[in-house]
Design a protein with these regions (language model features):
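Domain-level signal for soluble alpha/beta catalytic cores
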Residues: 1-377
Length: 377
């Protein structure tokens, strides 16, 4: 049990994936949207920023590298828009967070969904080429159930009518999404990807018992959507290659240092922790909003848990002793050798990013690294 080189994720000192966008990337994207910069010009700026980011990840001693999600506006929607049969539309409102609303975008089904020629495959190839010795390039994508949830909402006029013109039932839609994901995953694997991460806010919603109650969802309804989440996510990764590690990160919202949902993992643990066929769970535990560690007793034997005990929502550094103590508390439910440490989420799930500086961001990473070396000597 140590922090020495490991062949694949999770790593003792890990990350979720997104990083604060440099101003040059924000400016280039704004110029592109305004028609003042073409696609090749935008890509050149992104390429330079990603090279610099990967160099900083290496310098920080991370074994995993990502592109920081610098080529995206959102952690989830850009992937959905890259699927065949799904298009970008303006929604009536943005997503509602505590004290803040996001920009208004959504995803609409306009034809049969498939995963051929997804742009994220080319994005991954760029990062893969930057891997150093002992490093693993990670591709983050929204979980299949996240895509299902987005396209079945009613966030813009005609969204439901367009969906049902293509898929009459939820079962047909789920099958199509699972198949599309299998295609993208196979293409990523062929491009050399050995670590994929499903980012999943649907479970974070189901943790929020007050929000669930306000929607009128009954316990039976919650059971049905939880069953669907497990079934769809598992269908998307069925028959994956043995050397492809697929993990999942559960989030309660991470926009401009705000959150959307709260509540412990108790309602979802018997489904997510016990039955989802991923290798590891990256879980938020940075505030009391995430509840205690008791639901970890449902984690299937041999599965790994990455404890998100260091927040990305605030610059202040956590007390190292307190984090060490919490790791050992979690070890009452999952063996210490199956526990890992990371920030609770990314630093910029959307372009706007959280309210901290780049230096403060890297100080958080350094803190994770120090604590991991202390716990897993």
């Amino acid at each position: 049990m140590s922090t020495s080189i490991q062949p694949n994720a999770p790593f003792r000192a890990d990350i979720v994936g997104s990083f604060l966008r440099p101003q040059a990337v924000k400016d280039a994207r704004a110029a592109y949207v305004a028609g003042k910069l073409d696609a090749s010009g935008l890509k050149a700026v992104e390429d330079d920023a990603i090279r610099d980011l990967v160099a900083k990840q290496k310098a920080a001693g991370l074994q995993v590298i990502t592109d920081g999600e610098f080529r995206r506006s959102y952690w989830h929607l850009d992937f959905m828009w890259g699927l065949n049969g799904i298009e970008r539309r303006t929604s009536r409102t943005g997503y509602m967070f505590h004290d803040e609303e996001t920009t208004a975008d959504t995803a609409v089904v306009t034809g049969p969904i498939s995963g051929e020629n997804h742009p994220f495959v080319e994005h991954f190839k760029f990062v893969k080429a930057l891997e150093g010795e002992g490093q693993v390039a990670r591709q983050t994508i929204p979980a299949p159930i996240q895509t299902f949830s987005e396209v079945t909402l009613d966030r813009c006029d005609g969204q439901q009518e367009s969906l049902r013109a293509v898929y009459k039932t939820d079962e047909e839609l789920a099958d199509a999404i699972a198949a599309a994901y299998r295609t993208v995953i196979a293409d990523l694997y062929a491009a050399g990807c050995r670590n994929i991460q499903f980012d999943d806010c649907t479970w974070g919603i189901y943790c929020d018992t007050d929000f669930v109650a306000k929607t009128g969802m009954s316990p039976v309804d919650l059971q049905k959507v939880s069953e669907l989440g497990v079934t769809l996510n598992n269908a998307a990764i069925a028959d994956k290659p043995d050397d492809l590690v697929i993990n999942t990160h559960v989030c309660r919202g991470n926009y401009h240092s705000t959150y959307a949902f709260e509540g412990g993992y108790d309602p979802i643990a018997p489904y997510l922790f016990a039955r989802e066929d991923v290798d590891a769970f990256y879980l938020e535990f940075d505030t009391p909003r995430a509840g205690g560690f008791e639901p970890l007793k449902y984690v299937a034997p041999g599965k790994k848990v990455v404890l998100g005990l260091v927040t990305t929502k605030a610059a202040e550094l956590e007390d190292e002793d307190a984090i060490v103590e919490r790791i050992h508390e979690a070890a009452k439910y999952v063996p210490l050798e199956n526990l890992y440490l990371s920030p609770q989420c990314g630093f910029a799930s959307c372009e706007i990013g959280n309210k901290l500086t780049e230096d403060e961001q890297w100080a958080k990473i350094a803190l994770v690294k120090r604590i991991a070396e202390r716990v897993w000597k």
